[in-house]
């Protein structure tokens, strides 16, 4: 399995979003009637974040995330890539296994989701799909913007936003990192649940 890195150029800064590569994956499309009354509750070693979804602009990405979360796919994964002032990235199932650290950033669910580029801007707290150079290569990996990153607009599929737990985003983004922007302390997501909005915000 080949690790793919998509380089992003903004002014004189070169940033990379490591994404998964799957061998001849099938494509998930045509999801019908996703609901917007559910949110994602991501419990991490640094606290809990709640994210709302935008099914009106990215229905397939929303439903893909929900399906993976409801199956327990994300439980025990980690935010394996943290770039201060930019974003935190997670969703790779390989991060459950510390013996596979050299492969972190290459894992996925075994299928791809076609791009749903939209007019939502990549500002702080926005949830977006990580991908390779192929626009239709998103799978399970995602990132949450720590700061405005409008140079990603129209190139990455934004499909939700942080609505509770901004201090947790700050803690994770501030953690010490080493080579490959990997946190020194493992930023594990102990659970990722899909629950009614009212329940998550009470």
Which residues does each PLM region occupy?
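Cyclophilin-like peptidyl-prolyl cis-trans isomerases
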Residues: 4-8, 16-202
């Amino acid at each position: 399995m080949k690790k793919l890195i998509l380089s992003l150029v903004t002014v004189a800064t070169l940033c990379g979003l490591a994404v998964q590569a799957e061998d001849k994956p099938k494509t998930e499309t045509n999801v019908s009637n996703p609901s917007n009354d559910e949110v994602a509750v991501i419990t991490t070693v640094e606290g809990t974040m709640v994210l709302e979804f935008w099914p009106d602009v990215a229905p397939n990405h929303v439903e893909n995330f929900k399906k993976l979360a409801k199956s327990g796919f994300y439980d025990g994964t980690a935010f394996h890539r943290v770039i201060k002032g930019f974003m935190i990235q997670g969703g790779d199932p390989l991060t459950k296994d510390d013996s596979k650290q050299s492969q972190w950033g290459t894992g996925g669910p075994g299928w791809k989701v076609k791009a749903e580029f939209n007019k939502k801007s990549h500002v702080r707290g926005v949830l977006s799909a990580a991908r390779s150079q192929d626009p239709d290569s998103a799978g399970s990996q995602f990132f949450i913007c720590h700061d405005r990153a409008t140079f990603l607009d129209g190139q990455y599929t934004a499909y939700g936003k942080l609505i509770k737990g901004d201090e947790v985003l700050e803690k994770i983004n501030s953690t010490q990192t080493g080579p490959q922007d990997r946190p020194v302390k493992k930023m594990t997501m102990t659970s990722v649940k899909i629950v009614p909005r009212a329940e998550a915000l009470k």
